[in-house]
């Protein structure tokens, strides 16, 4: 494992159908800095159900808006509903009190990857790849990304349970590459331990958040070959207790979410492609879930008091600029914004891994532009 130079050090309700151990694991953190209302309206009922009768969405673990009319969704299979279906069912499992994260006995590995149009209708169903998740005794697909520097716009899907990462053609017709060995965890150069995310540097290198077992970030070359790694388990600067998401910013900045540590670790690339330098760490949050980096700030999701989901904006110096809370109450509430993405029109999409659905947020007409999340930073 490479050594990270330390340039600066600055020192984490009830779930429907969730076990007590899981409740304790999902920590919350205080809200600090400016707090205000959401700058978005949620479009109620946007995600149109498509499952056969007796089934509903599973956990929405990965969302990526390639365009306003093509939104990729990775879900943890579908949810088998009780028979008879309760009258209050309104298209998603959470509406009848099912927490799909924990109701694993109701999970079926179907329709794991698909795209939606701007109105929330299914556009493409990639069920030819459902077999990549079948037989999983864990959560399965965890994150979905597209490399902004790839002219072929290949689709990357991280499978946490099988310790693998898949690379598909943009139209879903071909599985181009598989990284990792199915059901074989490891901490060497070719294996993963419950990987969580991938990110892409402008020079072609690929970063893998690896993950809940290995607590490291792996640096790969453009062809997926191992270069080096950084991180490690712990509570110190540059260490992780479950790295969950990655974001890339200007001037070589790398933001890595330490999920169970409730922190954001900041690194910077160097002239050596095998090394990064540690820059800073910002703590005091609940579980940190997903991140988007803009030109001069970051947005990430986390749990605040009462396990309410917060969107937090910070500048690159670690100052908390704004926090807004996502409602928990149905019909439009969230138990968890596990993943989020923003399209080129400024619409926000949030995947709920517990209620089991994806929703669309549109900017309010009078929203302050400074409080809106922009698409991820890309080098020009």
Regions found by a protein language model. Give the residues of each.
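Bacterial N-terminal signal peptides that target proteins for export
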Residues: 1-9
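Bacterial N-terminal signal peptides
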Residues: 9-19
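Sec/Tat signal peptide C-region and signal peptidase I cleavage site
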Residues: 20-24
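Eukaryotic scaffold repeat domains enriched in small/polar residues
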Residues: 26-380
